[in-house]
Amino acid sequence: MGFSVFSPTRSLDGVSGFFQGAFLLSLFLVLFKAVQFYLRRQWLLKALEKFPSTPSHWLWGHNLKDREFQQVLTWVEKFPGACLQWLSGSTARVLLYDPDYVKVVLGRSDPKPYQSLAPWIGYGLLLLNGKKWFQHRRMLTPAFHYDILKPYVKIMADSVSIMLDKWEKLDDQDHPLEIFHYVSLMTLDTVMKCAFSHQGSVQLDVNSRSYTKAVEDLNNLIFFRVRSAFYGNSIIYNMSSDGRLSRRACQIAHEHTDGVIKTRKAQLQNEEELQKARKKRHLDFLDILLFAKMEDGKSLSDEDLRAEVDTFMFEGHDTTASGISWVFYALATHPEHQERCREEVQSILGDGTSVTWDHLDQMPYTTMCIKEALRLYSPVPSVSRELSSPVTFPDGRSIPKGIRVTILIYGLHHNPSYWPNPKVFDPSRFSPDSPRHSHAYLPFSGGARNCIGKQFAMNELKVAVALTLLRFELLPDPTRIPVPMPRLVLKSKNGIHLRLKKLR
């Protein structure tokens, strides 16, 4: 009898051969990756040998977790100018916290390596580079002209008053309040009304919490993705539980911003509203985008429009919410400065709640306290660049092309070489006659790519502080001292809890 080609023996031999081939291929890939890992690590060690570092794990790098700020401040004191941080065995970045180093990097046009943010905020001002970034920046700058910002002050005051009214109803001096949640809704309310022509108050809308919760989740998820040795691979990340959570949070965020765009487009279908918008000397943020024509005569694409809306929706509310919350905490823990600010505000506003544009320049001491709080608690702990060409610093040390450098704003603001007793709250650092390096204080970053909305944010900070101090004395909760932790914006590991004492 002849031997069949479909016999069990032949089939088993085929299966065995397949698995042997698969095993050898897998072994080759593992060895290839190991060699690639080794060569990359050796190249980094050689290229960055001038930048010191503490010992790190060969695979996990400096796994600092929630000890990051403590370790970083140690590095700032121990390693002048800059140091090396290993994020994994083959991924490193150079941390910069000296003004002279920072000035060099911010004077260049290197791209921001924030691709992990793209699924959420798209390619708006934060992620764009080159000619397109310049076009969008020039297009949006008029949205922050002082003629636009002036009437925003009343809108800001109204939003703050809604928050304070809610606090009065909840007021119980014996039960501290976690304030970031309320401040975040207030700043979202403000940016929605000012930049996106929103009617009503998101602070009174129970559905708004889903957006702020999504932003909170994305803050954590993106931060951990950037620090992970494995999540840099999109396939692995998308298959992970974090990847699934990220997609869901992005969906919620996009539904919110899509709704904002859709609502404004519908309003502009009304001829009266359309003519009203066109007669404005300076358009609001969203209207600029909707009316925009690029240099080639084409309208802004829907993708570009949503990216800019997503970007400003995030940066315009979450960063400012962080800043306001930490300013409140700083004043609560320094009652003598809080009282002096209150006296200054009362001398300008009396016991009323009317704040105008002109009032904002009449609060010099309050402004000094705000600036000092933003130094101690930098709302944006760091910003990064990926070098498009080699860079050499004033002391002769160099970094090659392709390396990520991180301007550690938190470290810069705590550098004892430029800020004596950096942990001490001292508003006099910002008195008019106190000189400092041009790049020693950067709460809104610096250079050509600084925060486009920095004046908007400072105005909101002043309004929030002034109106809050008229109605409440801020007291710390000694049982829950905030623990700052780095995320996309500065957060507290255990929240920011304050006791509120009603003044009137």
Curated annotation (Swiss-Prot):
Its cofactor is heme. The keyword Aminoacyl-tRNA synthetase does not apply. InterPro entries: Cyt_P450, Cyt_P450_CS, Cyt_P450_E_grp-I, Cyt_P450_sf, Cytochrome_P450_Monoox. Its EC number is 1.14.14.80. It is found in: Endoplasmic reticulum membrane; Microsome membrane. The modification Phosphoserine is found at S434. One of its GO terms (cellular component) is intracellular membrane-bounded organelle. Pfam families: p450. GO terms for molecular function: alkane 1-monooxygenase activity; arachidonate 11,12-epoxygenase activity; arachidonate binding; arachidonate monooxygenase activity; fatty acid binding; heme binding; iron ion binding; long-chain fatty acid omega-hydroxylase activity. Gene3D superfamilies: Cytochrome P450. Induction: By clofibrate. Residues 1-4 form a propeptide. One of its GO terms (biological process) is arachidonate metabolic process. It catalyses: an omega-methyl-long-chain fatty acid + reduced [NADPH--hemoprotein reductase] + O2 = an omega-hydroxy-long-chain fatty acid + oxidized [NADPH--hemoprotein reductase] + H2O + H(+); dodecanoate + reduced [NADPH--hemoprotein reductase] + O2 = (11R)-hydroxydodecanoate + oxidized [NADPH--hemoprotein reductase] + H2O + H(+); dodecanoate + reduced [NADPH--hemoprotein reductase] + O2 = 12-hydroxydodecanoate + oxidized [NADPH--hemoprotein reductase] + H2O + H(+); tetradecanoate + reduced [NADPH--hemoprotein reductase] + O2 = 14-hydroxytetradecanoate + oxidized [NADPH--hemoprotein reductase] + H2O + H(+). A cytochrome P450 monooxygenase that catalyzes omega and omega-1 hydroxylation of saturated fatty acids. Exhibits preferential omega versus omega-1 regioselectivity and (R) versus (S) stereoselectivity for hydroxylation of lauric and myristic acids. Has low activity toward palmitic acid. Mechanistically, uses molecular oxygen inserting one oxygen atom into a substrate, and reducing the second into a water molecule, with two electrons provided by NADPH via cytochrome P450 reductase (CPR; NADPH-ferrihemoprotein reductase). PANTHER family: CYTOCHROME P450 4A14-RELATED (PTHR24291:SF47), CYTOCHROME P450 FAMILY 4 (PTHR24291). This is Cytochrome P450 4A2.
